Amino acid sequence: MRLPIIKHVLGFIEANDEDWVKETIELLENMSEIASLKDEEIEVMGELLSNLYGTLEVNEMIKEGMDKKEAMNTFMKRVTGAIDK
């Protein structure tokens, strides 16, 4: 997960709405089933999906009243903690 990507997609959600991100997730998940994709291509799609799902989680925290910066930091701490386990 990359914080700059999450931050950028949050800006997109603010300017548009999160439905675009949800539809992009659906498209990428569908495309990941293409049998002829190379491993590297699947890895890139997986990384994009991780960042998009992460952005939706951060956006949910913001909608619940958390400050944007605090929401991003909380999310990244949770992700980092999960990786360390």
Kindly label every feature range from the protein language model.
Residues M1-K85:
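C-terminal alpha-helical interaction appendages
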